[in-house]
Amino acid sequence: MCSTCANVLKYYDWDPHIKLVINPNKFLHVGFCDNPLMCCYPELLPEFGTMWDCDQSPLQVYLESILGDDEWSSTHEAIDPVVPPMHWDEAGKIFQPHPGVLMHHLICKVAEGWDPNLPLFRLEADDGSITTPEQGTMVGGVIAEPNAQMSTAADMATGKSVDSEWEAFFSFHTSVNWSTSETQGKILFKQSLGPLLNPYLTHLAKLYVAWSGSVDVRFSISGSGVFGGKLAAIVVPPGIDPVQSTSMLQYPHVLFDARQVEPVIFSIPDLRSTLYHLMSDTDTTSLVIMVYNDLINPYANDSNSSGCIVTVETKPGPDFKFHLLKPPGSMLTHGSIPSDLIPKSSSLWIGNRFWSDITDFVIRPFVFQANRHFDFNQETAGWSTPRFRPITITISVKESAKLGIGVATDYIVPGIPDGWPDTTIPGELVPVGDYAITNGTNNDITTAAQYDAATEIRNNTNFRGMYICGSLQRAWGDKKISNTAFITTGTVDGAKLIPSNTIDQTKIAVFQDTHANKHVQTSDDTLALLGYTGIGEEAIGADRDRVVRISVLPERGARGGNHPIFHKNSIKLGYVIRSIDVFNSQILHTSRQLSLNHYLLSPDSFAVYRIIDSNGSWFDIGIDNDGFSFVGVSSIGKLEFPLTASYMGIQLAKIRLASNIRSVMTKL
């Protein structure tokens, strides 16, 4: 105890030398913790029971403890007993309790004797230069105030965290759209208590293992005063999953009006049965903002909806603390915060299906992809690593054959080359000849003007739908230069190629002149994916039946009013100097991060990123636990690149993602 604390206690006639008397009989039915620095659930673990009679001599106690130890029976090495160095009141026995149990009872004793009447101290500037503006209207009475004794006990158990000025002001957390189309019972905001609520807490959480305490949340409504409507702020206890129903109003709640001029502040209390939460603990108190009365704008018409924006800001509560310091680089077993899944600048965004730059987002009813798509469990249903490099195979053919089956030399799934493309051909083909591209009148297309003017493009090429690869083809004794290779997934039947949307080692189809003669020639082939022969087709990856999978094709549809999206880029076409769109389920950086790191995200939530274009338009992208991306608008429109991305936090998946892009509305 420091001298300052001792003087304060003496001033109030307290003896700073605290005397603790513990009855060891209270230890008899208390379980012990096998990880005393981490666990706080002693009642769930096996009981301890090592004890000795006080009537025995010290030597007898010593020998009994050694002979009763499990290690003695196997190693015959003496282990000295550990007896707590303190006086035991009413002691009929000497115990050897686990340190975690001992600390548990010591902390409880301290907490029981804590005086709630001790004064509070406040540090202020002596010249009045530091002032605090009115930050909002505090709404109380929602639930019981935080337990100061538990907070103090947690401090004594684990050490107090650092104080700083960031604790005093509100920081932006997210913004939520509230439109006139939202009906009563619609959840606009749901957030579980934890460090992810505040950017400073999120940053400092990297230094600690555990936390405890409340968080203050401030809501500001951007309405112009002509709106009517009310929102309900509901405190939901741990273990309850919020539902979009007015039955949620049976929980403690308060109301605030859309015409509220001043910000409204709520406190999310920390309701817990333990001294602190680990960073993996997501089953905490939740704050839910629900539509109580529909939003009304008398100046809106029936052809479109209008709304306002609810801005959410947070700061740690007075009892918020971090516990159990750790090195910032060490990884927690439960996962880290998904704040680095999208690079800040769009100049670093390339697709996970093809390596060109992302140029747009495409909203589809369903999004699907297996290859190079990773989820939050670091798993993929595909066969490729999240990187682009040349494909390496060997191919053996004879008698001048050009169609053969490749054998993988670099793979993560046996028999399937790492990086092999994931779409198949549109129908049966006999690969031979040259390009055959005509318009609707069967006239050859030979110029850009003819291609752009054609109302119909007919692709009669006998190797259409295959990928074009630059090739380094080598075989002993073969002095000829390498030829372009055309590859796909399909079944080779003689000279015929049959499409297949499932892949295995027998379907690595390669169409290439490897200069084989009468005898079998085995070539070492290094292939770089450059283009595509599917002239006139829809975007690559848009047709579910042509997307290749090993067995399962991961797929997602709309969730909670949010629509799944593809990330669009393009690949160059063969013959015509044009490109074709490619649909990617993820940005390659996202795939790479998900494959390398274990992130913390529950199945009912999104990791939310705000995308802002060069004109200031913005929308939120939510990435779910399966790695798919969603937006809250039905149409994004043209964006002005470059774009920037910033991490916004975790949001419930059933809540529509925010944006300032107005969807196109049609009156029927």
UniProtKB/Swiss-Prot annotation:
The record marks E124, A125 as: Cleavage. It comes from the Viruses. Keywords: Capsid protein, Disulfide bond, Host cytoplasm, T=3 icosahedral capsid protein, Virion. GO terms for cellular component: host cell cytoplasm; T=3 icosahedral viral capsid. CDD domains: rhv_like. Homodimer. Homomultimer. Interacts with the minor capsid protein VP2. May bind to VP3 and Vpg proteins. Binds to alpha-2,6-linked sialic acid at surface of target cells. Interacts with host F11R/JAM-1/JAM-A; this interaction allows viral binding and entry into the host cell. Belongs to the caliciviridae capsid protein family. This is Capsid protein VP1. It comes from Feline calicivirus (strain CFI/68 FIV) (FCV).
